[in-house]
Amino acid sequence: MTARELDAYFRSFLNFGPFVSCDVALNGLQVANSGAPVHKVAFAVDACAQSIDAAARAGARMLFVHHGLFWGRIEPLTGMQYRRVQALLTHDIALYAVHLPLDAHPQYGNNAGLAARVGLRQGGPFGFIRGTAVGLWGTVAENTTPSQEAMQQHAACTAPDTHRVTHANAISPSAGLSLQQVVHRLFPAEEQPVRLLPFGKQRIERVGILSGKAGTYLAEAIALDLDLFITGEIEHSCYHTAREHSISVIAGGHYQTETVGLQLVARKLQRDTGIETLFLDIPTGM
């Protein structure tokens, strides 16, 4: 497939439309290649010198990222930006970026992937940006394991509306998880959250998830009477706000919470097209 054909493929399911007015990122093909067929696609969180160099060493002809190079304004190709674009052109690598549509996708998105990890039963949309929901909230319980919920999400491929209306009140009020149980489910590969604010209930049921930098959405979590807010990165002011409203917060890391959707899309691409994929893990610790 060419880069243009891959652009059409990604657009066929990632649903850019709702985010045209609320996403400052340029979603889609940001830098083309020469038109040569793409037999390998590298996936990374950030378009940066490290990811471009790693993609080149791996022989990839496309780099698919969550954080691209262009963010809603005209940027001169000088300095760092010039070097990045020059490296892409030198190695004939197309750059493809998907920001909010990748966070929000109900099956292949960052938030859906995190929800599957913790075994979330979805209650409704959460994290509205100019009227468009990017995150989700729901409930967790000991009798809903991550693997069971992941299977439900897989089955939802042909019935996404059914998945969306699996309501929280289906779970017994006595069920719930401890904060450490949620952390263990969220980071099964021995990763660690950047910050925990353990100010909520001992047994957690109502959970909101919004990947990346979303500390400002703590107020929305409080308004929904959630027990736990899971995000990537928070502001200093979140500490006292969470403490005084008795809500726990997991700041899982901006990077760590945004690796999930990329890997889901990579698996789908390889399954659908046979194109080889690889994930470039370049953690920032943030």
From Swiss-Prot:
Top-level lineage group: Bacteria
Record keyword Metal-binding present: yes
GO MF term (any one): metal ion binding
Residues bound to a divalent metal cation 2: H67, H254, E258
Pfam families, alphabetized: DUF34_NIF3
Entry keywords, A to Z: Metal-binding
Gene Ontology CC terms: cytoplasm
UniProt record similarity statement: Belongs to the GTP cyclohydrolase I type 2/NIF3 family.
Protein name per its UniProtKB record: GTP cyclohydrolase 1 type 2 homolog
Organism in which the protein naturally occurs: Treponema pallidum (strain Nichols)
